[in-house]
Amino acid sequence: MQIYQFGKIVSKNKNYLILENHGSGYLIYVPRIDRFSRDENRKIYIYEHENDYTKITYGFASFRERILFEDLISIQGVGPKTAISALNSGMQNLINLIAANDWKTLAKIPYLSEKNAKQIVFEFQKKYERFNENHKNQTEETNQDSQEKELEKKDDLADITIQKSNLEDKTAANLEDTLKMLGFKPRQIDYALTKVEPNENFENLIENAIKIISNAREFRN
């Protein structure tokens, strides 16, 4: 499974961009294209959608945005174009609407019917409630870690070993919970937890864990 492409954005249109990587150009449709600038080097998380007639690559600014896109298109009647339209309203805004069971506001998004909005909330409300909770916990842990580093600078005798140990345990628990929500099996999750290296960016931590699972021979079909 290819998770992202890294390259230079050489062209940008209303709803797609062209990413150059090792001499090849990739046409990628993205939500909220204003976040991407021409001539910048950028990591873009990708999803390749293929049917009997076409193969289209969609791109995202973060791995979490990619996950949300996949969840949306898993709903019958919601295609990639509708999912991209929904993401144009903002990823966190969309997550908050789902978590809050606000299908009425969700249904105001272009191309998204009331029936589909209700189904999205029904399927994913609990998941994104937990996503928000995990994000909140991770932010608190990051703030705590920053405070601890400041203490180290101000007082070389400060002993925060126990606090750091607790932080690692909480991060592992949040990572395990996130991988479960993504549909990975307990054996795969346990394997990733033993192999993944610490990373202050939780999204990068998720990405690295998925890479480990994807590259492990014992989990390949």
Curated annotation (Swiss-Prot):
Keywords assigned by UniProt, alphabetized: Cytoplasm, DNA damage, DNA recombination, DNA repair, DNA-binding
GO cellular component: cytoplasm; Holliday junction helicase complex; Holliday junction resolvase complex
Region listing for Disordered, in residue ranges: 133-155
Lineage of origin: Bacteria, Bacillati, Mycoplasmatota, Mycoplasmoidales, Metamycoplasmataceae
Region annotated Domain III, chain positions: 167-221
Keyword Membrane: no
Entry text on domains: Has three domains with a flexible linker between the domains II and III and assumes an 'L' shape. Domain III is highly mobile and contacts RuvB.
Region of interest called Domain I, as start-end residue ranges on this chain: 1-61
Pfam families, sorted: HHH_5 (PF14520), RuvA_C (PF07499), RuvA_N (PF01330)
Source organism of the structure: Mesomycoplasma hyopneumoniae (strain J / ATCC 25934 / NCTC 10110) (Mycoplasma hyopneumoniae)
Bias (Basic and acidic residues) ranges: 146-155
Name the UniProt record assigns to this protein: Holliday junction branch migration complex subunit RuvA
Region (Flexible linker): 140-166
Function comment: The RuvA-RuvB-RuvC complex processes Holliday junction (HJ) DNA during genetic recombination and DNA repair, while the RuvA-RuvB complex plays an important role in the rescue of blocked DNA replication forks via replication fork reversal (RFR). RuvA specifically binds to HJ cruciform DNA, conferring on it an open structure. The RuvB hexamer acts as an ATP-dependent pump, pulling dsDNA into and through the RuvAB complex. HJ branch migration allows RuvC to scan DNA until it finds its consensus sequence, where it cleaves and resolves the cruciform DNA.
Family: Belongs to the RuvA family.
Subunit note: Homotetramer. Forms an RuvA(8)-RuvB(12)-Holliday junction (HJ) complex. HJ DNA is sandwiched between 2 RuvA tetramers; dsDNA enters through RuvA and exits via RuvB. An RuvB hexamer assembles on each DNA strand where it exits the tetramer. Each RuvB hexamer is contacted by two RuvA subunits (via domain III) on 2 adjacent RuvB subunits; this complex drives branch migration. In the full resolvosome a probable DNA-RuvA(4)-RuvB(12)-RuvC(2) complex forms which resolves the HJ.
InterPro entries, A to Z: DNA_helicase_Holl-junc_RuvA_I (IPR013849), NA-bd_OB-fold (IPR012340), RuvA (IPR000085), RuvA_2-like (IPR010994), RuvA_C (IPR011114)
Cell compartments where the protein resides: Cytoplasm
Region listing for Domain II, in residue ranges: 62-139
Stored Gene3D superfamilies: 5' to 3' exonuclease, C-terminal subdomain, Nucleic acid-binding proteins
GO biological process entries: DNA recombination; DNA repair
